[in-house]
């Protein structure tokens, strides 16, 4: 669940908004935005700061979601679980085995982001022209169970510990 939960919506646009949470202090808190089972959603030119559990999570058969020109950051208020973006919330195939087509374009992960930029189970994920400026991040991109990633023309600043960690997934990377 999220501070803002978008459930079962179709043809929905979120644009030019700032979402600021109290800080990432535990895994049991809310996401700033939780997209649940919605289709044809566009999130554009938004900023996400200090989500409790995550900044923007996309789950439960959401489909055809585009996140563009957004920024994600965790400040000093976030001392645990600074994991920004999750796609599919569990290993259960009903989460989105044939859904979860998600594009991340021209986004910027800034300081404090440690992991899940994004992490996905299932789905087809396209990442292009994104900027990872998050020194100290444990790992940026996490393809997981049965997900397919197309990763194109992304830039990773110095100081990122691991750019990529893959588990039971397919990823194609173009530089």
Where are the model-predicted features located?
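Right-handed parallel beta-helix
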Residues: 2-103
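Generic hydrophobic/packing signal
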Residues: 30-32, 107, 117, 162
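Extracellular beta-rich repeat passengers
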Residues: 119-175
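Short catalytic-loop micro-motif centered on adjacent basic/acidic residues
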Residues: 42, 55-57, 116-119, 139-142
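Aromatic-anchored, glycine/proline-accented short structural segments
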Residues: 81-136
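A structural signal for beta-strand register positions
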Residues: 18, 47, 71, 106-110, ...
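A generic "binding-loop/recognition-motif" signal
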Residues: 10, 39, 52, 114, ...
